[in-house]
Every structure is written in structure tokens, then in C-alpha cells.
């Protein structure tokens, strides 16, 4: 994407639109409800937030920077609230161009198992970020998704191994006795992965 096209697209995107694109880059797949909970929190009611998020996502879809998967949560009758969103190649190129990066990704319709697992991971991630926003004395200092949260370590024989959790989270809990900071690697298990794959992670 050349600079002129990127600039023209940027002129049509609000700060919240940009944040939605960055969320989709970070989390890979998000439902309309996830994005509503993350970015449409300043509305008078949940219904108003739902309508605003649906309008914004349809506008971003019309601009060609996001796409709804063919698969929906809860079936077609649930309407736009059931949509699962991802960046398009255009959306990814726009973000990459805005940072001056050359790397490219391919965007394909993911399989059902990947979608289910990714949405489960993101349910937890969004819940933690909501708790950070609403719960007094609790904060999320860092939340890393794959592959940014992967860690390299040495095995028993000195060989290089990798830890590949779904999420890495650092939280802080304040309390009368000073509170504490907790570091956690989180793995979401839906009972669909074989044991050797889990052990390999």
C-alpha cells in the first residue's frame, strides 16, 4: 500500500476505528460483542453501544479493512451481534504501512477449531481488560498474545525449547497489606487438543 492510499484511508478512520483495527491485529479474531466491550463503553446503554459497534464495523467492512467470517456465533438469527471479525489483507497492509513495516500476512478463513479456541482465549482477555477498567484495586499491567508471549528456555540437555501459552498476563492487586503482582502464563483448554500437542507447548 503506497503512502497516498494509506493517507486517504487514514482520513476516513476515527481514533476508535484505528483502535479496533489494532485490537483485531492483536487478538486475530473478535466477535462484535468483544469489540463492543473493548471500544464502545461510553454509551448511555448497552443497546446503544451494540448499535454503535454494529454500525462502525459495517462501515469498516465497507472500507475493506475488516471482514466478517462466514461462521457466526449462535447462528444467523443472532444478526450482526453474532459476527466474528478479522482484519483483511487491506487492513493489515494499512497498519503495516502506518508503521513503515514490510512484513505481510495472508488472510484465510480459519477452521472451526481455531475459531472456537481463539474466541475462548479472547473471552478471557477481554474479561481481564474489563476488570482492569471497572474493578477497584485490580489492574492489568501487561497482556501479551501469541506469538509475542512466547518464551525460550533451555531443556535438561541444554537444548533450546519454547513455551507457547495462549496469554501472558501481569496483574496487580492492591490491598491493605500492600498487595501483590502476579505473573501468569495462561492456556485455554477446550478439550479438543491431543495431549502430545499440549505437552509440546
Where are these regions (language model features)?
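Nuclease-adjacent, charged terminal/linker segments that flank catalytic cores
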Residues: 1-108
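Amphipathic alpha-helical dimerization/coiled-coil segments
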Residues: 93-143, 181
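Active-site metal-binding core of divalent-cation-utilizing nuclease and nuclease-like domains
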Residues: 6, 71, 135-184, 190-194, ...
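A generic fold-level signal
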Residues: 15, 79-80, 119, 162-164, ...
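Soluble or luminal CAZymes and related metallo-dependent hydrolases
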Residues: 52, 116-120, 197-200
Amino acid at each position: 500500500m503506497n503512502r497516498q492510499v494509506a493517507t486517504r484511508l487514514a482520513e476516513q478512520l476515527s481514533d476508535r476505528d484505528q483502535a479496533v483495527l489494532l485490537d483485531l491485529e492483536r487478538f486475530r479474531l473478535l466477535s462484535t460483542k468483544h469489540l463492543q466491550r473493548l471500544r464502545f463503553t461510553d454509551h448511555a446503554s448497552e443497546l446503544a453501544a451494540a448499535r454503535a459497534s454494529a454500525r462502525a464495523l459495517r462501515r469498516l467492512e465497507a472500507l475493506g479493512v475488516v471482514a466478517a467470517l462466514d461462521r457466526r456465533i449462535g447462528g444467523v438469527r443472532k444478526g450482526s451481534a453474532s459476527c466474528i471479525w478479522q482484519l483483511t489483507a487491506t487492513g493489515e497492509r494499512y497498519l503495516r504501512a502506518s508503521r513503515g513495516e514490510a512484513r505481510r500476512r495472508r488472510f484465510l478463513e480459519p477452521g472451526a477449531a481455531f475459531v472456537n479456541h481463539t474466541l475462548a482465549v479472547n473471552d478471557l482477555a477481554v474479561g481481564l481488560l474489563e476488570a482492569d477498567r471497572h474493578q477497584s484495586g485490580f489492574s492489568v499491567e501487561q497482556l501479551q498474545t501469541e506469538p509475542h508471549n512466547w518464551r525460550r528456555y533451555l531443556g535438561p540437555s541444554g537444548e533450546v525449547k519454547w513455551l507457547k501459552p495462549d496469554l501472558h498476563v501481569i496483574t496487580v492487586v492492591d490491598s491493605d497489606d500492600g498487595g501483590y503482582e502476579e505473573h501468569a502464563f495462561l492456556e485455554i483448554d477446550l478439550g479438543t487438543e491431543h495431549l502430545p500437542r499440549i505437552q509440546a507447548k
